[in-house]
């Protein structure tokens, strides 16, 4: 199953195709028969292009219709009717043909090659045929979720962060749920398909598996579609699009394409109907065979146009409706829907003000008229009527962190399904976070967990009769009978609350079963946390259903059952729990007895599911299995009792430890994560870990022997190591907490695991690390020493006690309180005896000190107890048996070394008695072993290698003894057998070395090397045979058949391996050549040797023998021998690295062996056997039940009461929890985890900083808008103040006001006029509004920033005639020139201010304006603003001028002054430069260059203004006549009239101009000083920049005169000319 998923998910179409050509042809024929294409067959000329049909194709590209096939309506009607009317119809003017385009695409041009399946189909294709194609031919799995992405077809830009979040969320939602993604398929610039494709591309580059992204595109819109034509072909597709073409290319990140064809070219719409029908059909499919839910569909909207809004409405009107997720911030339709969703009330009602705002937004977004916007608004309101189905994803919102949560939450909230169905959906998606956050919340439909307790019995009865119906066929019969029993309880179920609770519990239990089957570990944990009682849940039918499931990871359980049953099983074989019990016994091996195979369980199982009782009634619980009763009568009675068991009894219908059964199921089904989770739950965790370790190890061994894939065996072995490590860690954790309790965990009886102990399970699993743990070794050491207390030289003391028994009294003994391993009964008996002895031997006087108390304890132990405990200690038994064995070997040596008489000697009789008694001991070991059957006992006994050695040695000795008692020659044969047999007895000594720390590992090395050498001997035999046969055949061609040939083949080649080559060996005494031994003996015809003997004739080919021998020795003596040495070396280091564990493991075997042996060694052991038989018979006669128990449970086992067992389990659970807590803390503190957490935090911080940056930019734009509006309000307030002043008749000359801002829509002349009004006291302040920041600076000279303000409007001034012509140039910057006035140029203007600079200040004047000396230490910053300023020519006065000039914001006014034929530039809102004479300003230009150097640019070069600034006195001057033209007066009057302000005329007769030369106060504006000054910039209320174009030509002509009273503007031009110029440039209204 898992491999099929991998094959379908990976995209290798060539390996998925059918293996036979017949099936390929059949599939190809089915595709061509089922799917069609559409072609236009009737030409209806288009009104726009007569050479092109209404379908979009050229008229010459049409194909004639098939003669045998006609359209749906007759051709004549079509031609005469629709053709004449000019209406083109798909159904009437197109014809279906078998599809000719399907196969595989290979995308090129994207930097890497991707493959995708594609097919061209008609727009009206049946969706079931398409789904069949996708599942069967394309090998796709049915989705668990369908995400349909809709959005803009044109290019649009997404914010980088939003695009990243959108892509990650979409991919995660699809990956975690196994979803399909539907898109438009074609990329048009940066459309929504491109954005989805980018996300898919990022995913495919980071992971191997590809998501299933299906593009449903119109065939007529596909670029290079001619390359796709072909039947079942592989085509190369170029993704580079033609910029001049209206068609679009397919997106190369998709895996499949369905190209809908309706006969049109270059038109969208063919795919809409097909896509919707396919989505509807997929939603009707079931997610899983276990889950009844259909495939949920969700719409995802990103950007989009008006058609997307219509699609959303269609989704919401579906039955059932389809929930929609809208991505806010992506633009256009998405933002409009998000806005409406946010501010719309339930039922689609929105506030009037918001309604108007939404309508305006629709008009601006889609360029709609009012009627169109109202129509679209109505559609949006229809969507908002089902607001609960629309989920809006807003990036950075608190409730939603990513897109995937929005999608999955929308599916749960949007669909009106019940809570169990929602749980099934979350389970199918494997999204436990969704279930935890959205489903398991308390509400009106969710019962609190505490309310589940009262109706326990009814729930159990209801749920127990429900599940068996789905498990086996025969179990439906019992259901009806069971209902008869439950009918009495119907009255209790009439309460709707109880029924609701019961349904909820049943839904939770069904979800638990599904979660276990689908291997959803997190869901199992969640369900347990939310009230699922596993004892109520787990039943035999459900457990068997779990064992028979085909879902989940692949496993080898059926193979194991087949091996155990030793027969071929049918494919639909139903595995029962009895089969599982046999499998467990087979895997565990040894004496393990599974509860499923015990008679009590089998009888109950047969009663419930066999022919005696109806099948599938209730749960079956497992109670502690009692010892099998002996005797036929007892068996019959027991069977009757089991038949009469009340199955309805809850105590019987429960598994005592349900987590045990589930963990074993998870292990056998190869579900490691589930097994580890179930291991943490429940009791006896250490035993469960060891059982899992053994099961996995046995399964790995079986899979390796079955020649399965190596990966399976390796995975199983790794799982075994994981559980073994868990067992060791748990033992270490418990040992740290309490040593004594940890030792109890090792030795207490496990009733659920074949009455074994943890130590036995660890030995069965060959878990060396567990046995080598300090806790286990302390326990073994206590057991090894018994009650003896010896620290140094224990072996010597024991030998002395054995050889000299009185020394036993001088040895130290321990009390029973010090024992860690004794059973509870033995401990109590020992304590009672000890207390009696203490009471009997108590001294009258009191003793003090610990030493005296210790002495007292030692003296209180009686001599008999000391002797008994001494000989019962395993260490004493070991040395006793060892001494006995060594004595036996000495006698055996004597027997075979001396002459053997006809009748055995006394020494030989002792040897024979030793062997016979040892054989009886081996028989006793077999009979008293744990397995029940004798065959099983023998099988377990033979699994030990030393037992096999003993069996062979004893058997050989018995045969030799029988032959030895016979006459000659049989007696000689018997003696020879004796001689050979003693070799095995000497080898048996190696077992004694196992107790030694240093010799024990070497014994294991020898065993492993022997196995390695067996493989080497096979290889050596091949080489030896090859040379031996060739040599023998060449040197002895005339040999007769004889057995000596076999000897001669191996004899010489074998000894050559050890270096003996037999080169020219000669017997010097006899001088006889041993020709058979020579390599190349002398030979020849008619030749004689030195002694005159005739030489044999030469053998043909004898010269080859030395060459063959050289090659043989090279291979055998050098290559193979060194190879064997290398293998031995590897084995040595392998065992040496674990020598400590090996020795400790062997030590356990030795200790347990001598712990169970009788005290006396052979041959005296016969007395112990007689004692055991007598005790057994006496115990049976007395009917002591304890006797069987004690005899059966001899060994290292602790029997605990129920209360003690409960405390032990609680201690173990605490250790497990603390262990995982420490492990989690360790993982969190690891470097990798810290790096991961740090990277996540840094990423989150960067995202937050980006958000803050975006918000800051938005706030800046908002503040600029607010600032602009405030300036407008300020200007309006100024106007109102002026109007009120005029109305109140207040003289403006008495008011001194300074306004720092003016409206951006005011004229420059009006601002000058206003400034003069504010300065009517005689001290002029010129206020100009510049477009830039508010920059106030103080200069030694009169310098100012560039006069970009004058680009706004041309202002004409009356100029004093000094030159022939006066010309008004384009101002660029202000420059103070104290020198003589330059020659006048045409159009040049000068601005004069009357009054000498040295005039003293009068009381009541502006206190901020005063004359003062220049400060040479002042900060000179004019280099940045006016770099041409010459400080040497600056006058010794400080004059500051505040200049304010405003610009209009509307494009109409900008276009009026700056036509479109010049360069454009950005405009900024108005700012001010302030200059005043004698004033020391607090604000300057310190940050001018830093803030504006990067954004200011020179718009155009301008000429220079030269303006004369003079002080004005109260009296009129006669030197400078005041000239006012009539046109200027008229214009001034019109300006004031336009602003509805009746400004009184200022008396010009009071103004006088001083006689001071003009050259001392000139303000010059030069072109080169505009560098670095900000351009005119303006922003709309929405923050969008607007462009304006300057017009230098309009600045050249004269404007209107200023109406200020303190400005004398003189011009050289005639008054009439000035008037004409002034009339040609009317001012705009402020």
Curated annotation (Swiss-Prot):
Biased composition (Basic residues): 474-485
Gene Ontology molecular functions: calcium channel activity; monoatomic cation channel activity; monoatomic cation transmembrane transporter activity; monoatomic ion channel activity
Biased segments, Low complexity type: 8-25
Family the entry assigns: Belongs to the transient receptor (TC 1.A.4) family. LTrpC subfamily. TRPM1 sub-subfamily.
UniProt record, GO biological process: calcium ion import across plasma membrane; cellular response to light stimulus; G protein-coupled glutamate receptor signaling pathway; metal ion transport; monoatomic cation transmembrane transport; protein localization; protein tetramerization; retinal rod cell development
Organism of provenance: Rattus norvegicus
Biased composition (Basic and acidic residues): 825-834, 845-855
PANTHER family the record matches: TRANSIENT RECEPTOR POTENTIAL CATION CHANNEL SUBFAMILY M MEMBER 1 (PTHR13800:SF13), TRANSIENT RECEPTOR POTENTIAL CATION CHANNEL, SUBFAMILY M, MEMBER 6 (PTHR13800)
Coiled coil feature spans: 1235-1255
Name assigned to this protein: Transient receptor potential cation channel subfamily M member 1
Region (Disordered): 1-25, 65-92, 453-492, 620-643, 824-858, 1362-1414, 1575-1630
Extracellular domain ranges by topology: 899-944, 997-1008, 1129-1158
Annotated TM spans: 878-898, 945-965, 976-996, 1009-1029, 1108-1128, 1159-1179
Sites carrying sugar chains: 1129
Assigned keywords, A-Z: Cell membrane, Cell projection, Coiled coil, Endoplasmic reticulum, Glycoprotein, Ion channel, Ion transport, Ligand-gated ion channel, Membrane, Receptor, Transmembrane, Transmembrane helix, Transport
UniProt-annotated location(s): Cell membrane; Endoplasmic reticulum membrane; Cell projection, Axon
Subunit structure: Interacts with TRPM3; the interaction results in the formation of a heteromultimeric cation channel complex that are functionally different from the homomeric channels. Interacts with GPR179. Associates with both guanine nucleotide-binding proteins G(o) and beta-gamma G protein dimer; implicated in directly regulating TRPM1 channel open-state.
Known catalytic reactions: Ca(2+)(in) = Ca(2+)(out); Mg(2+)(in) = Mg(2+)(out); Mn(2+)(in) = Mn(2+)(out); Ni(2+)(in) = Ni(2+)(out)
One annotated Gene Ontology cellular component of this protein: new growing cell tip
Topology in membrane: Multi-pass membrane protein
Biased composition (Polar residues): 69-92
InterPro entries assigned: Ion_trans_dom (IPR005821), TRPM (IPR050927), TRPM_SLOG (IPR041491), TRPM_tetra (IPR032415), TRPM_tetra_sf (IPR037162)
Function of the molecule: Constitutively open nonselective divalent cation-conducting channels which mediate the influx of Ca(2+), Mg(2+), Mn(2+), Ba(2+), and Ni(2+) into the cytoplasm, leading to membrane depolarization. Impermeable to zinc ions. In addition, forms heteromultimeric ion channels with TRPM3 which are permeable for calcium and zinc ions. Plays an essential role for the depolarizing photoresponse of retinal ON bipolar cells.
Cytoplasmic compartment residues: 1-877, 966-975, 1030-1107, 1180-1630
